[in-house]
Amino acid sequence: MLVHPQFDPVAIHLGPLAIRWYGLMYLAGFIMFLWFGRLRIRQPHIAARGWVARDLDDMLFYGVLGVILGGRLGYVLFYKPGYYLTHPLEIFKVWEGGMAFHGGFLGVLIAMWVFAKVRRRHWMEVTDFIAPMIPCGLAAGRIGNFINGELWGRPTDLPWGMIFPQAGDNIPRHPSQLYQFAGEGVALFIILWLFSRKPRPMGAVSGVFLIGYGAFRFLAEFAREPDNFLGLLALKLSMGQWLSLPMIVIGAVMVVWAYRRGNGATAAAR
C-alpha cells in the first residue's frame, strides 16, 4: 500500500515570498512550450510558413493570459457558479486554487484568435502550430496536482492504490493525477509531435489534439474522484467527461473536414 508523501505545497521560501510547487509547474510548462516551440520552427514545413522565435514569445504572452483568465472563469462557470455568484470577490483569489482546463482551453483559443488577427495569420494555422506543445503544460500541471495531493482518484484495491491523507478517509485510491500525466501529457505529446512532423492539411493537427485530449480525459475520469460539490451527472458521467465529449466530436469533424478540404495540399505548402 502506498501513501502520498504530503509534500509541502511551498517549494521555495524567499523571505515573505512563498513560491508554490503549482506555480513552478506552470513555469515549467511555459519553458517547455518555448523549448519545443523552437524545435518546431526548425522543421522545414513550419519554417516555410515564416514562423520565427519572436512568434513564440508573443504567443506565450497571449497564451498565459488565456490560460489564467480562461482557466479561472471556466472553474467559476462550470463548477461553482452558485458559490461565486454569492461570493464574487472570491473569483480573484486565484492563489487559493480553482482552475479548469476546459476554461483555460477556451481562453487560449480566444487568445490565439487575437494573435492570429494581429499577425494576419489564419487562426487554425496558429492552433495547428501550438497544439503539439500544449501537452507539455498539461503534464506539468498534473504533476503539480499530485504534489499538492489534490484531485485524487476513486477507491481501488489495485497494488498501486495510494492513500491520500488529504482525502481524510484512509482509503487507497487511484493516483489519477499520474494517469492524466501519462495520458493527456506524455502520450498525447508523443502522438501530436510525431503526427505534426510531416505537413498536414490545415486543421488536422488541431483536430487530433481535440480527439486525443478528449479521449484521454474521458477515460481518466473513470478513475478520478468526482468533485464532491457536483458528483456524477447524467448517465453517471462526471462534469469533466461531459465537457470532453464535445471536444472529441468537434475534433473528429475537424480532421475529416481538413482532409476533404485539403485535396493533397497542406497548410504548410500554401
Curated annotation (Swiss-Prot):
Membrane topology: Multi-pass membrane protein
Primary localisation category: membrane
Domain of life: Bacteria
GO biological process entries: lipoprotein biosynthetic process
Compartments reported by the entry: Cell inner membrane
InterPro entries, sorted: Lgt (IPR001640)
Documented EC number(s): 2.5.1.145
GO molecular-function term, one example from the UniProt record: phosphatidylglycerol-prolipoprotein diacylglyceryl transferase activity
Keyword annotations from UniProtKB, A to Z: Cell inner membrane, Cell membrane, Membrane, Transferase, Transmembrane, Transmembrane helix
Segments passing through the bilayer: 17-37, 59-79, 95-115, 129-149, 175-195, 202-222, 237-257
Pathway(s) this gene product operates in, as recorded in its UniProt entry: Protein modification; lipoprotein biosynthesis (diacylglyceryl transfer)
GO cellular component, one term: plasma membrane
Residues that hold a 1,2-diacyl-sn-glycero-3-phospho-(1'-sn-glycerol) according to the record: 142
Keyword check for Transmembrane helix: yes
NCBIfam families xref list: lgt (TIGR00544)
Record function comment: Catalyzes the transfer of the diacylglyceryl group from phosphatidylglycerol to the sulfhydryl group of the N-terminal cysteine of a prolipoprotein, the first step in the formation of mature lipoproteins.
Family indicated by similarity: Belongs to the Lgt family.
Protein name: Phosphatidylglycerol--prolipoprotein diacylglyceryl transferase
Organism of derivation: Cupriavidus metallidurans (strain ATCC 43123 / DSM 2839 / NBRC 102507 / CH34) (Ralstonia metallidurans)
